[in-house]
Amino acid sequence: MKKQVFASKKVGVLPARWGSARFTGKPLASILGKSLIRRTYENINQSIALDKVIVATDDQRIMDHVLDFGGDCVLTSPECANGTERTAETISRYFPEAEIIVNIQGDEPCLQHTVVDALVRKLEEFPEIQIVTPVAKTTDSHEILTNQKVKCVFDKNGKALYFSRSPIPHILKKETPIYLHIGVYAFRRNALFNYIESSPTPLSQAEDLEQLRILEHGGSIHVCVVEAKSPSVDYPEDINKVEKYLTCHSSASF
């Protein structure tokens, strides 16, 4: 049988695995009558910058579900250690012509396609940038203090200096801005595969943040400051928070 390949040059990949330690079967969790993965897919599929949006999964149940609602999906290896590895496998096997790849976490059901479009535009406008990711300003003390939310500091040119689960920078003055990292990355093709070929690093393992591996190997990640900040789903109890958010933002296209 002929191998399926796509000619798309700008691709959004939604990695979705069944066996999450924190929330088994999370992609199929229902949120106001639609699955988490469907909500994420349908939001991102409105993108005007991407040629293709595709779910990459290691589980037939997820694939069947995505195909049932009319989405595109491919099966990947269960050996992938994280979403970036699953994204890279998808691009390597199915998208030989892809130049810009956006890795979109499947647990972001409220993420708007405009965020993805902004990242793609950044890579198109600035050829020297290899990787770009969104951040959003916060004043919420819980978000700042919890280790479930990743914070980012960056220089005056928008280049990330560090990502941490701890509050950074340390706040001596109330007006100091704090930025939350949103788990979406736009890569140039070479940058994605350079990450895959790199070895794990001490800080990335200490913080359990894969993006630190790029910084520790001397790579650069640029940030794109966005207004949109919405809840993600990490645990079963987050479903209720997301449903409340969607109910309050019912005028948005969810």
Curated annotation (Swiss-Prot):
It comes from the Bacteria. One of its GO terms (molecular function) is 3-deoxy-manno-octulosonate cytidylyltransferase activity. Its EC number is 2.7.7.38. Pathway: Nucleotide-sugar biosynthesis; CMP-3-deoxy-D-manno-octulosonate biosynthesis; CMP-3-deoxy-D-manno-octulosonate from 3-deoxy-D-manno-octulosonate and CTP: step 1/1; Bacterial outer membrane biogenesis; lipopolysaccharide biosynthesis. Keywords: Cytoplasm, Lipopolysaccharide biosynthesis, Nucleotidyltransferase, Transferase. It is found in: Cytoplasm. Transmembrane segments: none annotated. One of its GO terms (cellular component) is cytosol. It catalyses: 3-deoxy-alpha-D-manno-oct-2-ulosonate + CTP = CMP-3-deoxy-beta-D-manno-octulosonate + diphosphate. One of its GO terms (biological process) is CMP-keto-3-deoxy-D-manno-octulosonic acid biosynthetic process. The keyword Magnesium does not apply. The keyword Cell inner membrane does not apply. PANTHER family: 3-DEOXY-MANNO-OCTULOSONATE CYTIDYLYLTRANSFERASE (PTHR42866), 3-DEOXY-MANNO-OCTULOSONATE CYTIDYLYLTRANSFERASE, MITOCHONDRIAL (PTHR42866:SF2). Belongs to the KdsB family. Activates KDO (a required 8-carbon sugar) for incorporation into bacterial lipopolysaccharide in Gram-negative bacteria. HAMAP family: KdsB. This is 3-deoxy-manno-octulosonate cytidylyltransferase. It comes from Chlamydia caviae (strain ATCC VR-813 / DSM 19441 / 03DC25 / GPIC) (Chlamydophila caviae).
